[in-house]
Every structure is written in C-alpha cells, then in structure tokens.
C-alpha cells in the first residue's frame, strides 16, 4: 500500500500555479503566449501517479494506491486516475474530525458511506476503506461498509493528535509512531468481525515484531500492515516478520495461514466473553491483585 495522496495537495498546487500564471494578466495580455498552460506542469497527482506506474512495472506484487480526500469529486476523479495508472486496488483513507458541535454521528457515518459508494461506482478495481476507531457502533458500520461494496476494511485509521508546548505556548503537531500496546483495539474488532462480513479484514497499527503479526492473524486478519516498524528498522524488517511467522508456525505445526487465521476470533476462541464486557471485571481484579 502506497502512502496517501491528499486532495488538499492537488487543490493547493493547482491553485498556486494558476495564480502565478494568471496574476496580473491584464497588464501584459500580449505576452501571455510565452507562458505555458497549467496543464504543461506536472502538478497535483502527477508525481504520485508516475510513481505508481513505476511501482507496478517494477514489482510482481499488487500495488495499492491510497487516497485521502474531502469531497466526492476529489475522490472520484483521482481514484479513476489511480486505476488508469495501474493500481491493483485503492485504499480510501478518510481523515475527518467532526469538530462542528452540530454535526451528529449519523451525518459523519453517511459521509463515509457516500464516499465509498461513489468510488466503487467509479472504478472497477477493489476498494478498501480505512475505518475510524470512533464510530459509536463499529460493528454496525463495518456491516454497512460491507453491504455498500467495500472489498476490504482496514482497522483502524490512526488520527494524529496535537500536544501543547508549555514553554512556547503553542500547539505541537509532531508525529508519534505507534507502539505494540496499540494493537489491542484493532485486535478486538478484527476478532469480532472475522467470519461475519464478506470484506477482507486488514490490521494496521502497532506491528513492531512477529508477535503482533501472529496475534492479528489469529484474531482473523486477512492482511497485516506496518509502517512504524519499517520506518524504524528499514526494509529488512519485512524479512524479520516473515521469518518469525514461519518459525512460529513450524514450532506449532501449522501447515498454512488458513489453518491459524481466525482460530482465536470471537466466534472460534474458547472464551468469547473475553472480547466483551463479561471479562471487564476480571481484568480489573487481576490488575489490582498484581499491585497488592
């Protein structure tokens, strides 16, 4: 999966060049023929699409483009360009913070569904959507995305949150990489959704060793994604993950991924209550016991 192309990048670059070309045209109209048209520049998605084309030509594995947009038009036009550039699939990466106090949950959910439906109608390649972890009913939204045609659900979008600098008295917008402790929320919902939706389930966040990869697969993930691990350890981290998974499977005599995938999901584990509220009190009691 490639990094996301942002609709704002497209709009900003196009608007900036348009301004440079047309600003003050009334004062030198006769010289306009010396200036190139906006289309002559490689702006907006052009560099991304060129990289996408080169990637699909260079590797034998599927290359999935990722799109972060804010309007239906922005999603649709760019999604079509990605398909034409050779993408094997598209990941929709909605990043929407409903800061308006008058925007209710149904409106937010409907916006996500409309985007998915619009892109599905515009392209013929598979479309995945990255879910927010803040839906009031995650299972219900997963079902609606599934019924709307999503080919895969990516759990979850990791919204970047600001901090405050107490010395400079300003908002800090730095990037904090994930940690292994963050796998628990996506692990919960992948375990719950496994076998209950037709869409494939992709896990993301917190994969820093083969252990997290194995846990996601046991919960029911069809695919496991990692970014922080790659940034910290480089390309060789992929070999570490695959080797660790293979060693674990051989030790436990698993012959295939299909054999272990979902074997500890909500539907298949010996204690399904561990995924739900029934285990809540036990967790608190165990924690208290450790610190007596």
Question: What are the residue ranges of the model-derived segments?
Answer:
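Short glycine/proline- and acidic residue-enriched helix-loop micro-motifs
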Residues: 30-39
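Conserved active-site loop/cleft motifs that coordinate metal ions or position small ligands
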Residues: 202, 225-226, 258-261
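Helical hairpin unit composed of two closely spaced alpha helices linked by a short loop
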Residues: 223-229, 233-234
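Short, small-residue alpha-helix embedded
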Residues: 193, 227-229, 242
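Alpha/beta enzyme core
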Residues: 2-30, 43-64, 68-203, 208-224, ...
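C-terminal extensions of enzymes
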Residues: 233-252, 258-292
């Amino acid at each position: 999966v490639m990094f996301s192309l942002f609709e704002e990048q497209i709009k900003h670059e196009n608007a900036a060049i348009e301004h440079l070309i047309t600003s003050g045209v009334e004062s030198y109209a006769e010289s306009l023929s010396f200036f190139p048209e906006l289309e002559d520049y490689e702006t907006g998605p052009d560099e991304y699409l060129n990289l996408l084309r080169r990637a699909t030509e260079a590797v034998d594995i599927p290359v999935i483009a990722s799109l972060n947009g804010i309007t239906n038009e922005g999603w649709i036009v760019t999604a079509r360009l990605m398909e034409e550039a050779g993408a094997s699939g598209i990941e929709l990466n909605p990043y929407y913070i409903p800061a308006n106090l008058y925007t209710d949950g149904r409106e937010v959910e409907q916006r996500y569904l409309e985007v998915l439906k619009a892109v599905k109608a515009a392209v013929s390649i598979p479309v995945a959507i990255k879910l927010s972890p803040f839906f009031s009913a995650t299972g219900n939204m997963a079902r609606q995305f599934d019924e709307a045609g999503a080919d895969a659900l990516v759990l979850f979008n990791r919204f970047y949150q600001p901090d405050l600098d107490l010395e400079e008295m300003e908002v800090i917008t730095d990037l904090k990489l994930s940690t292994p402790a963050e796998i628990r929320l996506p692990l919960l919902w992948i375990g719950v959704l496994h076998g209950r939706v037709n869409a494939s389930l992709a896990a993301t966040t917190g994969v820093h060793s083969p252990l997290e990869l194995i846990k996601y697969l046991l919960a029911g993930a069809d695919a496991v994604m990692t970014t922080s691990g790659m940034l910290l350890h480089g390309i060789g981290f992929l070999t570490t993950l695959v080797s660790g998974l293979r060693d674990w499977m051989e030790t436990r005599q698993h012959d295939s991924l299909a054999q272990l995938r979902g074997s500890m999901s909500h539907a298949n584990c010996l204690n399904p209550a561990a995924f739900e509220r029934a285990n809540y009190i036990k967790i608190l009691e165990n924690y208290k016991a450790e610190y007596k």
